[in-house]
A protein has these predicted regions:
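Conserved beta-strand positions in the central sheet of alpha/beta enzyme cores
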Residues: 42-43
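Short beta-strand/loop segments at the ligand-binding rim of alpha/beta enzyme cores
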Residues: 12-23
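Short secondary-structure boundary segments
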Residues: 23, 46-47
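Aromatic-residue hotspot detector
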Residues: 23-24, 70
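Short, surface-exposed, polar/charged, turn-prone segments marking secondary-structure boundaries
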Residues: 15-16, 47-50, 69-73
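Active-site-adjacent beta->alpha loops and helix N-cap segments on the catalytic face
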Residues: 1-11, 27-35, 49-64
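Extended, intrinsically disordered, low-complexity segments
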Residues: 63-97
């Protein structure tokens, strides 16, 4: 995705319009990213038809789209430039098992 900011902005400004990404998706992870940004669907052709295993690639995209959409609907946590501890560990020993 060349401009995730633009897709995020479109979703925010057009919350009740169906938004579909129809170009630039070459890997299942790209579809996940589009769906996590709030897109309603993706259109695919070359990424599936030109793969070495189109049936397997179609399955991978199906799972990627489902996961991305479910993540968006579940409410992704905001991204951060720094790691932020969310587990209270103050005064507790920390042991890796």
């Amino acid at each position: 995705l060349l401009n995730p900011w633009a897709l995020r902005t479109l979703r925010a400004r057009l919350p009740h319009i169906t938004l579909i990404v129809d170009a630039g998706l070459g890997a299942p992870s790209h579809a996940t990213a589009a769906m996590e940004l709030g897109m309603d669907a993706v259109l695919l052709n070359s990424a599936v038809s030109q793969s070495h295993n189109p049936v397997g690639m179609a399955s991978a995209f199906r799972h990627a789209v489902q996961g991305g959409r479910e993540g968006f609907l579940s409410g992704l946590m905001p991204s951060s430039d720094m790691a932020v501890a969310t587990t209270p560990v103050g005064g507790q020993p920390f042991v890796l098992l």
